[in-house]
Amino acid sequence: MSQNFGKISQVIGAVIDVEFEPGKLPPIYNALRVTNPAIDDKEYNLVLEVAQHLGENAVRTIAMDSTDGLVRGQAVLDTGKQISVPVGRKTLGRILNVIGEPVDEMGPVNAEKEYGIHREAPAFVDQSTKVEAFTTGIKVVDLLAPYARGGKIGLFGGAGVGKTVLIMELINNIAKQHGGFSVFAGVGERTREGNDLWMEMKESGVLDKAALVYGQMNEPPGARARVALSALSIAEYFRDEEGQNVLLFVDNIFRFTQAGSEVSALLGRIPSAVGYQPTLATEMGELQERITSTTKGSITSVQAIYVPADDLTDPAPATAFAHLDATTVLSRQIAELGIYPAVDPLDSTSRILDPQVIGEEHYSIARQVQYVLQKYKDLQDIIAILGMDELSEEDKLVVARARKIQRFLSQPFHVAEAFTGSPGKYVELKDTIKGFQEIVAGKHDDVPEQAFYMVGTIEEALEKAKKLAA
């Protein structure tokens, strides 16, 4: 079969129009290649993805890299297939870009198999209908906002409250406890942070259990709008062909939408609310519907969500919310108390915090813990103005227990051992439930509150109390 060539007819930023001979139009989503000497000296080094058909013999494409240096009339090769990325175990420990090329200077990936990045969501009959919790070994998450296997979790937090450390601990725990793999998609975030994550994962020994796919802030919008799909295809291979329970991290899902809106106007679509693309909900749905549990395995995804101007009603975060099963909200006030992970126990939610899924005992203890913490929050104004002495005996007891709960919700992480100096702890769910049940029931009212800070189980807290007393 002879190769199909076209030629560039116009270049509009990240969008490029290509003319073909009549009857030879490449289908939508096909990858075309063109030589851009401004990138490097390789031939056909720039990938264009077909987005629209313009009449009989022209297509409009989105570029996956810089278009500086392209000229009209240049030859464009139709590869005859979608953008495809290498999948399988060879991708572990590697950093790939949106088109599946390694960018870590460690040689070619040499994977046996490739997947196209646009794939159908699993058919309804293949999806698993069983709802079950996915234990992370992190007390505050497992107790108050448990993750669902095959669910989608939104991770909210400002700068510097510990999103990355929490993500790394989850990667570590899933690798060690479940033997599972993780895929990390860096979508439109800082290159420095991507590099830091890679270095830290190397140091903490979790790199060989994860594949990293980066399309950072400096990349053109085409790459940022597709890199999440590339990472998802790698995760789907582990789920569908190896029957694994995979963890997929997307940092940051807002940038996926942002990139789509940058390209949308160039493609000639009329913008909708707040200047976003009219296809916002469709694009988000195509990505999110592929993240699910099937009868073979599951993809559980944790997505960091940037909220523009802290406005939760902005169309981008609001569209993402529709897909979430649980939210983990990181709070600066809690981080300021030195309590890590700085998860807000009253703001974080989960769809499966339901006695029918997690059981009556777990549910009732979670609700009691939230009640005590909420009561403490309500009393804080009184304490600030009048002091502790003005509280009733009953309220004093609530405050004392709440402060113990607050401290017991912290725990040392494996990936932060270098900073904290204390070994990381993975806490089994039954130990978490037992510990909080005893605190709420008042079994440890005589134990000083600092004994509960940065420990794993309740037994460790009591050990620590003995040391403090000695």
From Swiss-Prot:
Recorded GO CC terms: plasma membrane; proton-transporting ATP synthase complex
UniProtKB keywords: ATP synthesis, ATP-binding, Cell inner membrane, Cell membrane, CF(1), Hydrogen ion transport, Ion transport, Membrane, Nucleotide-binding, Translocase, Transport
Enzyme Commission code(s) on record: 7.1.2.2
Topological relation to the membrane, as annotated: Peripheral membrane protein
Domain of life: Bacteria
Reactions catalysed, as given in the entry: ATP + H2O + 4 H(+)(in) = ADP + phosphate + 5 H(+)(out)
UniProt subunit comment: F-type ATPases have 2 components, CF(1) - the catalytic core - and CF(0) - the membrane proton channel. CF(1) has five subunits: alpha(3), beta(3), gamma(1), delta(1), epsilon(1). CF(0) has three main subunits: a(1), b(2) and c(9-12). The alpha and beta chains form an alternating ring which encloses part of the gamma chain. CF(1) is attached to CF(0) by a central stalk formed by the gamma and epsilon chains, while a peripheral stalk is formed by the delta and b chains.
HAMAP family the record matches: ATP_synth_beta_bact (MF_01347)
Protein name per its UniProtKB record: ATP synthase subunit beta
Organism: Geobacter sulfurreducens (strain ATCC 51573 / DSM 12127 / PCA)
Organism phylogeny: Bacteria, Pseudomonadati, Thermodesulfobacteriota, Desulfuromonadia, Geobacterales
